[in-house]
């Protein structure tokens, strides 16, 4: 398990590709990206960035993204995600998978040119209390310090089960996973829906996802305990939280080897994340555009 804790930059770059997709194994069955059997290799050159919500941590730039995919019967490996699909049919499949957790990625170091630090904005209350009620909306006061002195967050691995159902041009999926690396013993699940549009060589994919993360997982990455308080941060105990995502992808197929690809993803973090003094922004926008070459 220490291999994941000291994960190389190359493996993290591979994981960046996986972080753009809405579900753990949904990308492994998209005919626009992958083959059904054998080895599929590729690389895309372009520009983009993965938004980083952590205080004083830069957005992660994306330039050259490799693609490594292996399919052998019911087993597959795609962009650091391993899957076994023992149950499948013409329009459904059930898979067991193992993948890296994206939250640990926000705390790792990268050698690429860093983007500007994101700026947080206040979140006003939805409705004021009625006059004379004596009830006040609690105000979360974040005290921040030196982010370099907080305790180390390691990149964890999650394993679970996912079910996918395809209906006409729609794909619906649900997954639930638990941690393997024993860092936070957290749980994570999600529901997602995607709609595919095909126009000759043009492909458009629209998706929406709701993720649920357990209190243990949120507290491990975004909680503030003794060491964080010593570094100047206010205390915070993580609680179960949600991530809400919208995603749009566009591809243009020049031929079997060359494609233009683009992805944009908006993600909203619930108050369980936003109230943490380690979180700088709860509205995240990630994107990438470039040319992909399939070997």
Task: Please tell me what each predicted stretch does.
Residues 251-295:
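Predominantly the C-terminal beta-signal and adjacent terminal strand-loop region
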Residues 29-33, 51-53, 72-87, 167-169, ...:
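Outer-membrane beta-barrel proteins
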Residues 27-78, 82, 104:
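Short glycine/proline- and aromatic-enriched beta-strand/turn motifs that initiate or cap beta-hairpins
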Residues 35-41, 62-64, 75, 88-94, ...:
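Outer-envelope beta-barrel architecture signal
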Residues 1-37:
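Cleavable N-terminal export/targeting peptides
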Residues 47-53, 72-74, 98-104, 167-169, ...:
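Transmembrane beta-strands of outer-membrane beta-barrel pores
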Residues 81-190, 198-201, 205-207, 217-238:
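Outer-membrane pore/translocation modules
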Residues 45-47, 66-72, 83-86, 159-165, ...:
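Residues on the lipid-exposed face of transmembrane beta-strands in outer-membrane beta-barrel proteins
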């Amino acid at each position: 398990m220490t291999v994941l804790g000291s994960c190389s930059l190359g493996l993290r770059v591979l994981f960046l590709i996986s972080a753009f997709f809405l579900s753990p194994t949904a990308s492994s069955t998209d005919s626009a990206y992958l083959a059904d059997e054998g080895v599929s290799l590729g690389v895309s050159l372009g520009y983009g960035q993965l938004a980083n919500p952590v205080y004083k941590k830069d957005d992660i730039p994306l330039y050259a993204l490799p693609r490594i995919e292996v399919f052998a019967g019911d087993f597959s490996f795609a962009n650091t995600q391993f899957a076994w699909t023992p149950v499948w049919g013409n329009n459904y499949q059930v898979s067991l998978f193992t993948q890296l957790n994206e939250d640990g990625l926000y705390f790792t170091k990268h050698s690429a040119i860093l983007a500007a630090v994101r700026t947080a904005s206040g979140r006003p209350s939805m409705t004021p209390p009625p006059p004379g009620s004596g009830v006040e909306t609690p105000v979360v006061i974040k005290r921040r310090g030196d982010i370099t002195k907080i305790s180390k967050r390691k990149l964890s691995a999650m394993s679970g089960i996912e079910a996918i159902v395809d209906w006409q041009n729609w794909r619906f999926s649900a997954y639930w996973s638990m941690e393997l690396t024993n860092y936070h013993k957290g749980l994570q699940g999600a529901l997602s829906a995607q709609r595919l549009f095909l126009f000759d060589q043009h492909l458009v994919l629209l998706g929406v996802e709701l993720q649920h993360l357990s209190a243990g997982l949120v507290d491990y990455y975004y909680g503030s305990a003794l060491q964080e308080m010593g570094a100047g941060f206010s205390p915070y105990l993580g609680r179960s939280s949600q991530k809400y995502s919208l995603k749009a992808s566009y591809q243009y197929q020049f031929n079997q080897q060359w494609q233009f690809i683009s992805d944009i993803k908006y993600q909203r973090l619930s108050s369980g994340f936003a109230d943490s003094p380690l979180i700088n922004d709860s509205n995240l926008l990630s994107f990438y555009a470039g040319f992909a070459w399939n070997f």
